[in-house]
């Protein structure tokens, strides 16, 4: 039997047709196809890849994260039925970061490692300086356990920065999509540079891949990853991720689903890490997954 290649996926979404029916008709675009944990695992394993750690991240179009909890049960059933095939898979989850939803009970689930704020294309000026620091949010931060993190996603670096500055400094944070840097603005975009500086000052902020939303060309994304490594440190990058099922389009209007599947996404981050390694002399493996123990210890 061929030896499987071990992989970590620090950002993926699993959801069913039943999950999607809950939001059918309420979105301004076509719903994605269902993306189940079972199909994802089978496709990777059959391709010679062994996913050893997977983070099922809250899907922004859903009103809650019940799909994340359902995936925990799904894996448990798979492992009971076929421990040889699925027994080495570890699944964790990041749930919706809404104070009313992220209760003590939900955050206490042993597989929940964090909670996600989703702001999409919210402009910086729409984020008041107290939006994420009122009484309800402060109580939520207190409920986060020391190993858990707050996951922040916005399409503008300045929006990410405004949120980050409202979070207590002892709360660990992960910034999605490399801080949402923009290829056309370059690595000197003031807001992105300020975000890196804030992250360095705090010392407990990580930047997560896979990076193809910055550019689907690895060498271009690598410029930004190199800057993160130099500004914040190689121990603050979580590059190995797929963001499956690859919703949206790239800078040239091509659907990500036409460019990537999980295997191709892993190949993409490998290529990015190779470019960064040449520029920094940091080993590829460290760039890909060196910080994963801090994500899910």
Please identify what each model-predicted range represents.
Residues 1-73:
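An N-terminally biased module of ancient metal coordination in phosphate/nucleic-acid-related enzymes
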Residues 8-12, 55-59, 87-93, 113-117, ...:
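Hydrophobic faces of well-ordered beta-strands that scaffold small-molecule active sites
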Residues 13-18, 64-67, 98-100, 122-124, ...:
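Active-site environment of divalent metal-dependent phosphoester hydrolases
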Residues 36-46, 98-108, 192:
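Short, acidic/polar
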Residues 66-155, 206, 211-215:
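Active-site gating/metal-coordination segments in enzymes
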Residues 68-87, 170-177, 225-232, 258-259, ...:
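Short, electropositive alpha-helical surface patch
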Residues 69-76, 101-109, 126-133, 156-171, ...:
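Distinct, well-ordered alpha-helical segments
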Residues 182, 186-297:
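H/E-rich (His + Asp/Glu) clusters that bind or coordinate divalent metals
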């Amino acid at each position: 039997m061929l030896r499987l290649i071990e992989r970590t996926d620090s950002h993926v979404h699993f959801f069913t047709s039943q999950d999607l029916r809950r939001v059918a008709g309420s979105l301004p675009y076509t719903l994605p196809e269902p993306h189940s944990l079972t199909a994802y695992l089978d496709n990777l394993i059959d391709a010679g890849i062994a996913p050893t750690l997977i983070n099922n991240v809250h899907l922004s179009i859903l009103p809650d994260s019940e799909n994340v909890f359902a995936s925990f049960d799904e894996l448990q059933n798979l492992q009971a039925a076929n421990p040889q095939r699925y027994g080495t898979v570890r699944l964790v989850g990041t749930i919706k970061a809404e104070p009313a939803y992220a209760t003590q009970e939900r955050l206490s689930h042993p597989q929940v490692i964090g909670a996600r704020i989703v702001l999409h294309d919210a402009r910086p000026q729409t984020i008041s300086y107290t939006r994420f620091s009122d009484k309800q949010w402060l109580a939520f931060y207190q409920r986060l356990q020391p190993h858990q993190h707050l996951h922040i996603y916005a399409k503008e670096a300045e929006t990410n920065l405004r949120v980050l500055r409202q979070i207590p400094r002892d709360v660990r944070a992960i910034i999605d999509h490399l801080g949402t840097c923009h290829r056309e603005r370059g690595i000197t975009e003031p807001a992105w540079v300020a975000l890196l500086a804030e992250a360095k000052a705090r010392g407990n902020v990580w930047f997560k891949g896979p990076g193809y939303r910055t550019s689907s060309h690895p060498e271009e994304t690598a410029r930004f990853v190199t800057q993160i490594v130099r500004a914040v440190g190689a121990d603050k990058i979580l590059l190995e991720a797929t963001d499956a099922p690859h919703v949206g389009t790239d800078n040239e209007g091509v659907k990500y689903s036409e460019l990537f599947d999980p295997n191709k996404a892993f190949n993409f981050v490998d290529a990015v890490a190779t470019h960064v390694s040449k520029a920094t002399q940091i080993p590829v493996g460290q760039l890909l997954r060196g910080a994963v123990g801090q994500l899910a210890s």
